[in-house]
Amino acid sequence: MDSEYYSGDQSDDGGATPVQDERDSGSDGEDDVNEQHSGSDTGSVDRHSENETSDREDGLTKIHNGTDSENDEPSNVHASDSESEELHRPKDSDSESEEHAESPASDSENEAVHQQGSDSEKEELLNGHASDSEKEEGRKHAASDSETEDTLQPQGSESDSEDPPRPQASDSESEEPPKPRISDSESEELPKPRISDSESEDPPRPQVSDSESEELPKPRVSDSESEDPPRPQASDSESEELPKPRVSDSESEDPQKGPASDSEAEDASRHKEKPESEDSDGENKREDSEVQNESDGHADRKGLHSSDSEEEEPKRQKIDSDDDGEKEGDEKVAKRKAAVLSDSEDEDKASAAKKSRVISDADDSDSDVVSDKSGKREKTVASDSEEEVGKEESSVKKSEEKDLFGSDSESGNEEENLIADIFGESGDEEEEEFTGFNQEDLEEEKNETQLKEAEDSDSDDNIKRGKHMDFLSDFEMMLQRKKSMCGKRRRNRDGGTFISDADDVVSAMIVKMNEAAEEDRQLNNQKKPALKKLTLLPTVVMHLKKQDLKETFIDSGVMSAIKEWLSPLPDRSLPALKIREELLKILQELPSVSQETLKHSGIGRAVMYLYKHPKESRSNKDMAGKLINEWSRPIFGLTSNYKGMTREEREQRDLEQMPQRRRMSSTGGQTPRRDLEKVLTGEEKALRPGDPGFCARARVPMPSNKDYVVRPKWNVEMESSRPGILKKGLSRLEKHKRRFAEQKRLSQMHRAVKFSIEGNRMPL
């Protein structure tokens, strides 16, 4: 059987063309009985030839046919040969199919009823009714052998395992609209998809997707169900008289594929089925080959089904109900064994029980498939709704963030407003410009200011939370009590008194400072000398220089008091120079001040006023500029630690801060510039006397507009470094020796210098 099957006659190359010849011969020259066989053969061949287009499917078909033919009983050998030849030798299929028409009388397995058992099995997956016809034959024809009834169950099982590949192959080939047997996917699309037996194919079960059609053990089960006595129409796979779309294995999905009626009705419907079989997808083709193999060799259905399931597992993995199909296949393999062992008479009785089992299995699997798919659909719908809700929430959050922090465009305005609040707005009367840092740094660091502002707000929130903290441990309560009872005594630097509570001293000092500033303003209005601040200045400086009180002063509001002292008097005159110098020094020594403190105290405006005032001393202006730079850098997130910057960063910063000079425009009157390279290469000729733009006089060189920021490399590093090395290398001993030699040379007695009148031997 192997040799016959894998012989050159069965090659894929010649299988496609003879299909049409076989169809013609089967339709024209054969009797009705023969037409049934030839038609089934041709249908199988046609689908098989189409199936040969796909190598993988064809390979599977060959494997199944070979195994089936090998496993055929001696009586089935003839049937398997004819079937295999029909598949792979379509030209000879007509004669062989005729022999089949005659052969049924000879062998019980090849009986006319069962001739369709093999042929119809070929067409089972073509028409999806082969299993139906065989099963009904088992009921109607008691003389049917174990083969025919083996096929009933095995086809159900193999169709289960083979269904997954069908729908996948059917998608591409199911594009032929005119034929109702378009494909699994198209039949699923049709509203009438599973009009077959009421039991097997409930209308609500229309296959929703390829995976369903693959999973559907229903069609297979429907074969057995459709064989119920009330529906004897499905005697043979070819009996397509009845438009009842007998939803058999693959064609349970094809609405118009009527259940296979007996061979009598096949004559008219056979011709229709032939084109339909051509139109049927690679699924049906693969099914044809597999079903033929099933009819021939049912003993090895186990191996076939296991191999089929193994090969088709990759496809089943795509399907949700893969496991169900495999389980059912295993159960049905066991059933096939029992069927093979039983006699033909026993099989007639056992077929009914097997059918009932298959039906129950199919119903269970169908219900599982439907439940799984419904659950998946619900999940997908739920996920979609959740995603929409998540999007809405994200949009709401974004809008809230914009309300809280403002958009990016607003961040720049916020920084400008903050600078204006702290240092005041720049006026036209400015005489000097502040060049602390360049605009690029400010723009790059705008985002960090928002973070710092958020941190400040968080700190405020934390303070509020601390006030409202209800729960305190015993240890914390004890610490608070101890702190309140005994404040630390701090000794003043002048060695004087002890201060029991720093807050009282700081608050009293601030009150005195504010009073002195108010008195000076009143005295200035009265045209009297304002000396209150000067008299209080030493005490203020003494307390403000104490390291342990600086934080307390800042928290208590000393910045507003200093602002009052640095502000100009009502007559627009500046306070005393000594006051300005001392307070600016103290401000530099104070620790970092928060932006809120700078904003509310107004110290920034006072310092900026001094920085811009034309009569302010240069030293005070420098200190004021440093203060402004130091206070404003945190607003823009710039670091004030230049030591941490690399050389490249410093050079880049200097380059960016270079003042942009106005480019001199080369306009009329001046000689138009020429590209020297073009002049040298001859592309552009030099101007000659008489040419426009030629100047017959010497010209002053054009000033260079370039900014030289890259220092040229020093090419005499070794020479310049030697003196340093020598100086560093001189030790005390060397210095002493040199000094001693110099003294000795100077202390030596010099002889009388001989000189000549001509000037010879004179020391130069």
UniProtKB/Swiss-Prot annotation:
Q: Which InterPro entries match?
A: RNAPII_TF_IWS1 (IPR051037), TFIIS/LEDGF_dom_sf (IPR035441), TFIIS_N (IPR017923)
Segments of this protein annotated with the region Disordered: 1-465, 642-676
- Chain positions found as N-acetylmethionine: 1
Which residues get modified to Phosphothreonine?
380, 435, 671
**Which regions span the lipid bilayer?**
none
Which residues fall in a compositionally biased region of kind Acidic residues?
426-446
Give the record's keywords alphabetically: Acetylation, mRNA processing, mRNA splicing, mRNA transport, Nucleus, Phosphoprotein, Transcription, Transcription regulation, Transport
One GO CC term of this entry? nucleus
Q: Which PROSITE patterns match?
A: TFIIS_N
Q: Where is this motif: Integrase domain-binding motif (IBM)?
A: 415-441
Q: Where in the cell is it found?
A: Nucleus
Q: Which Pfam families match?
A: Med26
Q: Where is the composition biased (Basic and acidic residues)?
A: 44-67, 85-102, 119-144, 176-197, 267-320, 370-381, 391-405, 645-656
Q: Which GO terms describe its biological process?
A: chromatin remodeling; mRNA processing; poly(A)+ mRNA export from nucleus; regulation of mRNA export from nucleus; regulation of mRNA processing; RNA splicing; transcription elongation-coupled chromatin remodeling
Entry comment on modification after translation: Phosphorylation increases its interaction with PSIP1.
Per the annotation, which location comes first and is thus the protein's main one?
nucleus
Organism superkingdom: Eukaryota
Q: Which residues carry this modification: Phosphoserine?
A: 27, 54, 69, 157, 170, 172, 183, 196, 198, 209, 211, 222, 224, 235, 237, 248, 250, 252, 261, 263, 277, 280, 295, 306-307, 309, 321, 342, 344, 360, 365, 367, 371, 383, 385, 407, 409, 411, 426, 457, 459
Gene3D superfamilies the UniProt entry points to: Conserved domain common to transcription factors TFIIS, elongin A, CRSP70 (1.20.930.10)
Domain TFIIS N-terminal: residue ranges:
560-638
Q: Where is this region: Interaction with SUPT6H and ALYREF?
A: 469-764
Q: Please give the family membership noted in the entry.
A: Belongs to the IWS1 family.
Show the PANTHER family listed in the entry.
Answer: PROTEIN IWS1 HOMOLOG
- Self-association state and partner proteins as the record states: Interacts with SUPT6H; binds preferentially to the POLR2A-bound SUPT6H. Interacts with ALYREF/THOC4, SETD2 and PRMT5. Interacts with HDGFRP2. Interacts (via IBM motif) with PSIP1 (via IBD domain); phosphorylation increases its affinity for PSIP1.
Its annotated function is as follows: Transcription factor which plays a key role in defining the composition of the RNA polymerase II (RNAPII) elongation complex and in modulating the production of mature mRNA transcripts. Acts as an assembly factor to recruit various factors to the RNAPII elongation complex and is recruited to the complex via binding to the transcription elongation factor SUPT6H bound to the C-terminal domain (CTD) of the RNAPII subunit RPB1 (POLR2A).
Kindly provide the name given to this protein in its UniProt entry: Protein IWS1 homolog
